[in-house]
């Protein structure tokens, strides 16, 4: 069977004010998003809220949690030199910018125990995250001995890094070469068919993270294991197809925001 892992997420400055009912919060004030900076006590409360959320997930019967530290959300914002301009213990040096994530991981491990699966999602390059700093954060997580897996969202698993000094090998290779000890590594980013799954797994990656293709086919993993040449259905697909794959009407409506994913009308 499968494991149930809850992803813990706070959008920070990416939170829509009309949805949350107040001004978004960010490591440092941000004029573009009209976000104000967390106070020091609010940062500690944020940390405690992540820990409490993990504990609630455990009590609800989940096998583990993943802390979302990627895609420009709040943990990523703290890691980013671009968005984190704080002058307290949570800003400045990379070690200080990593502090919130380290404290969240420490708190979850202490509250939920080492038998409760704990993963961290990270992403390089965008939102001010430099590749070398992303790798350093991975190594900090590994050396802590408190995480079971790292989930690296690469945007495109097969592309070369954006930073010229790292372009001798793909983004995938940079992360696959990390000495991760007993920590498992998964990657995401334009892994869409059986051939690409195999290529990633043969690159010293423990498992793959699938988004779009798993939305198109709820049984994508089984199809890939049964057919090494499996290709998902071409997009756009009808709302009816997505309903048959188990998507709710709200989910289907949301997927309509993805350009070229859902057709505007059912075919006869």
Predicted region positions:
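Flavin-dependent oxidoreductase catalytic cores
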Residues: 1-268
